[in-house]
Amino acid sequence: MNQNRGASHGTEKQEVFEKFIMINRIRSNIQTNYTFCDIIRKPTAKQIAFLEELIMSPAIEDKEEYRFYYRILKAEEAMLSGQWDSISSFIFGEAENGAIVLKIGQRIIPKPIQYQIAISLYTDKGDMYDEIVNIVKNGREHRPNDWDKEMPECVRKENTFTVYRAGKESIDKAVDSLSWTLWRDVAEWFAERHEHYGQEKQHLYKATISADDVIAFTNSRREFEIIQYGGVRDIEELPRIGVSAEYKELFSATSYDFHKDQENRTTALDLFAKWYRQNNAMGET
């Protein structure tokens, strides 16, 4: 009996040791690929299967580290086989993973694909990572021809847009701020939100930007966001008037139900169009 227990204990120790060695090897390979991007160490099928087993194990409660490594290895595997569309599926909504993958793949992922990935990550905490921000800043030349397909019809064909921004930066620094919006209510909402969570006093800026200088337009979160770098002009500071009651109602209606969310998106577009027409008629946009 004691011999069996000893053998079992020895097997467990060996398994723990082998797990430790494998995790360290995976971590080391990722770090090497991140630091030296000229030659990428391809993840092995054994490493991926090892992580899959850990992620599926009911005996392990905290699996986030293993998921973190797994996403990177699968993205590396996709980039090394030229499966560009697959890369995003492994890092969607994971800005930290995405920043690492973009750095590792900077020499092999085509620039337009890097642009697409960086823009999708930027709007979801990606502004915290230089690897993402630097691609966004230099992304204008990789902007697709249909970059404005999600833009409201009432402004889509304009050559120049009026944009707004809430920020703590001084007016002379605002030109290099990446995130602006077509809708003043969005900027007013961000100003209130930032101050509510203890950030510095927010300024509300208004500017114009040529369509040719826009890096991207995104509306995945109903923020009507214009992404730019150094393209805005005629910047002025506006008095804060607060968020409109209609926008507050719209924001409070945010839903994770797909059909309800689609309904809210339509409502947002309608409200924006109404606001745009009213202010355009008054010459205030």
Go through the PLM ranges and name each one.
Residues 2-162, 169-178, 184-285:
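Conserved NAD+-utilizing ADP-ribose enzyme module
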